[in-house]
């Protein structure tokens, strides 16, 4: 809002001003206004294709985007469960490939999100021809399409004795295979932004806090009610993992400052979080950016 006289104030002339008509009026004062520029974050049309370790975050993303004050976000989801949701399986299934291509062919998808991992990537640990096929098709109908690849947490968390054992393989793969793969894609498609969404890190960090007795919202690691980190033996996301993971999706896709997010609006068991989800999300996002700065 600009400072100054409101429209309800009338300009009244005093008697002295009427009498002293021979006195030249003072020159108007020069007023310098400082207007803070505000970066408007534009909403995106985002298409997520994949399985259940990504779908809940894509489903929750619109409400988080709205809480962050971003308008016009559009979310599309094409879901197939388990291995059928990998980029390779989605491409090899003619029916689902057509479904996804029909959405992309509309030409207005800003961001295509896929999730790890195709069988051929698990074997090679270097490349994924199916991801490249999806990128090629998306760019053929909209050259301005950007891409994000999501790396989830290991399934069957109860099979691991502790968080150290649980996190060892995913951290090793993230460093030795995942980021080199992302970097290779960036070299192949320099005209597009290709991001890594490491929401799997959320599960690792939450389990670490739980095992150290520092996660007051959670009394059992795996439980539907009361909510645990995971809801079942497979390792599907409980509420706290869903909220932290969606913050990571939000921060990756829209590059917002987590401190600006109204975290008090997020509830678990009807209560606000004691755990600093914003700080955890920001740390994970910052570490991904640091890796990008070293390798990109």
Where are these regions (language model features)?
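Conserved catalytic region of serine esterases and O-acyltransferases that act on ester linkages
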Residues: 220-296
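Structured segments of extracytoplasmic/periplasmic soluble domains
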Residues: 56, 63-71, 103, 137-141, ...
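Alpha-helical cap/lid subdomain in secreted, periplasmic
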Residues: 101-239, 251, 260
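Short, conserved catalytic or interaction motifs in soluble domains
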Residues: 7
